Amino acid sequence: MGGGIAYALARKFPGLEKAYRVFIKENCAYEYSNDGWLTKEYKTGSMLGKIHLFKACDDLYIANVFGQNDVSSRSRQTSYDATVEAFEVMEKALQEEALKGLPLYFPYKMGCGLGGGNWQIYSAIINLYFPEATICQLPT
């Protein structure tokens, strides 16, 4: 949660980053280094394809989609297959009573900045699983 949209959301919603770290600790062998970065053990872990749901308020949940293990400006780190797997998990989660009927929002170019993904591919995956979703782009 040190960059991009995750960083902005963590600043806006106190408790998100702590809940995220607890989720990772419970679901994958990892440690945070003294500077707050995940160690290499996590980067080879099995978080790909999972989601972490955080209740920000009564009618807003934030879903962390684990579609990449690392960031790089030189090569693609995002996994389209892992994103599809996570979306399938999210699709099932959205059937729960507390989540039914809530609007869905996805950040524009999700997985494309530090993850190196292709937005045309990502937007097609989003539209396939969640055609009713709104893509949000912050003004620059």
Question: What is each of the regions a protein language model found here?
Answer:
Residues 1-140:
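Macrodomain-like recognition of ADP-ribose-binding/processing modules
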